[in-house]
Every structure is written in structure tokens, then in C-alpha cells.
A protein has these predicted regions:
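Interdomain "pre-motor" coupling segment immediately N-terminal to P-loop NTPase/helicase cores
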Residues: 1-28
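Intrinsically disordered, low-complexity regions
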Residues: 16-19, 29-32, 57, 164
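Walker A/P-loop NTP-binding motif of AAA+ ATPase domains
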Residues: 36-212
């Protein structure tokens, strides 16, 4: 079944349960495909699942797999839930961090070291979703004021861009934010965090589906 799905480059939800046979990690919690809502996001996830499966079969270069996405919206819209469920749907490890954790030590070298550690942890998993919350805290170079502050965040943003340009095979980055407009446009360009999904608060029907 899974070989036929790979040949047609189209995995159905029933096929996704077979991905573990390809060496993909099992993850706890529901799959994205089992959750109510997220219809646009599910369509993208199916495309990525196709490509990840082909990559694991050495039939597709990782550079041809979507490298990242942004989920944004007000608090309570399920951004973290989406990231975990997306990883589950693809059988990938879920590695979660925040820009705030990277910044905790305050010194640029410590921030960069923490950033590299997150990417290294994801790279070591042989297939992982690196979920980065507080994504807007990376900064926007057009909004920086003060020479010292500007230099600090230019270093941080430039290093993040370098990591995205040289993203390890098997790593998909999901950024999450309440404030998309505060993110540097270079971070969101094609080939980096190129898919953008706005999440809204669930309506009554979706809430009902989630509890039944």
C-alpha cells in the first residue's frame, strides 16, 4: 500500500499509518488529520508527508521538501497543538523551543549558542519538526532602534537566516507568533518560512467536534 502511494506521490490518511515501516518515529498525541478544522493546513501537511516519505526512500532531495511554515493568530488558537499534531501526522520528532529561551542569557554568544543547540537537537532526530514559539521576538531589522540594540538583533537574525539556508536534512521549522507583522521579511521569504497559516479561535461546531 505504501509503495503504491509513494509511486503516485500522494499519501492518503490511511497510508500515513504505514509510515512507521519507513523508519519514521512514533509520536504521542493526535495526528493533525484526526483534529477538527485545520483544513488548509491539512492539505499542506499531506503534500509534505508525500515528500518526506519520498525523501526517506532516497527518491527526493531534502531541498525539494518544504522547509518551514508560520502559524499566527491570537492566543488560544492552537498554534502549539498544530505543531505537535503536524509532527505526529508525519511521524517526526517534535522539538519545541522559544526565542525567549534563546535570549535568556542575554549575551549574543549565548543566544546564538542556544539557537544552534535547538537546530542540532532537531538534526540529530533523523526527522523532526523544530517548533519555535514567540517567533516575532527574532526581531525586524526595519524596526530596530538604537545602535547597540540594532547590532545585537542583526547578528541574531543573520545567524537564523544562515541556519535556515543550511537547514539540516530531515528538519522542518514551524514558527508561531501572535504578531506576524513584527517578523523580518527576510525570514518569511520563499525557501525559508514560506508557508503562512492564520489560525482563528475555534467556532462552536469545531469545539463540539473536538470534545466528541
Amino acid at each position: 500500500m505504501i509503495i503504491a502511494a509513494l509511486a503516485r506521490r500522494e499519501l492518503k490518511e490511511g497510508d500515513l499509518s504505514e509510515l512507521s515501516r519507513l523508519g519514521m518515529a512514533a509520536a504521542e498525541g493526535p495526528s493533525l488529520f484526526a483534529l477538527p478544522g485545520y483544513e488548509r493546513e491539512k492539505a499542506w501537511a499531506r503534500l509534505v508527508a508525500n515528500d518526506v516519505a519520498l525523501w526517506r526512500q532516497d527518491k527526493l532531495e531534502w531541498s525539494e521538501v518544504g522547509s518551514g511554515a508560520l502559524v499566527y493568530g491570537p492566543p488560544g488558537t492552537g498554534k502549539t497543538q498544530f505543531g505537535q499534531a503536524f509532527a505526529n501526522a508525519l511521524g517526526l520528532k517534535f522539538v519545541s523551543t522559544t526565542v525567549g529561551k534563546w535570549q535568556k542569557a542575554g549575551h549574543p554568544d549565548d543566544t546564538l549558542r542556544a539557537m544552534h543547540q535547538s537546530f542540532a537537537e532537531a538534526a540529530a532526530a533523523d526527522g523532526a519538526v523544530l517548533f519555535i514559539d514567540e517567533f516575532d521576538s527574532l526581531g525586524h531589522r526595519g524596526m530596530l532602534h538604537g545602535e547597540r540594540y540594532q547590532l545585537y538583533w542583526q547578528i541574531v537574525i543573520n545567524e537564523f537566516l544562515s541556519l535556515m539556508t543550511n537547514l539540516p536534512d530531515g528538519v522542518i521549522v514551524i514558527g508561531a507568533t501572535n504578531f506576524r507583522e513584527l517578523i523580518d521579511p527576510a525570514v518569511l521569504r520563499s525557501g525559508r518560512i514560506e508557508e503562512h497559516f492564520e489560525l482563528s479561535l475555534p467556532d462552536d461546531r469545531t469545539r463540539f467536534s473536538a470534545t466528541t
